[in-house]
């Protein structure tokens, strides 16, 4: 049975905050199969994700920066010093493959490449039941064309990265990759 849990942190140190949020999200879950991470543009996102990976090594972790804060079951989480939220998913039958890439010169081709990499990471040769995608604003449709050329039409969810001033300072991250 699918279970989910959420953790967050407003610690000033990005690495410590990433670790704290990831550990809190994993509480009570047998085996975390995927971790969605959303954080502040004020953090060094490479450091934040380093803390996440330290807390939950070998768990596919991915996400993006968020506009001024995140919403959790406990309410709105934000801080001038930074914030991070994580949602852990756990299910014995879950197979997760995560992949990411910089835009490149052809976002349709990038989407195709990322879909193939994610399927390989999940150990799957068939289309997933659903997928998640986050991208920079105005590029999502191009990536989706490339992804759907590989896996066909399957349900998906996700969104666009953001920053506090919508000026292009947003970040996307997956494992140890930051864009």
Pin down the residues of each PLM region.
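Cofactor- and metal-binding active-site motifs of prokaryotic enzymes
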Residues: 1-179
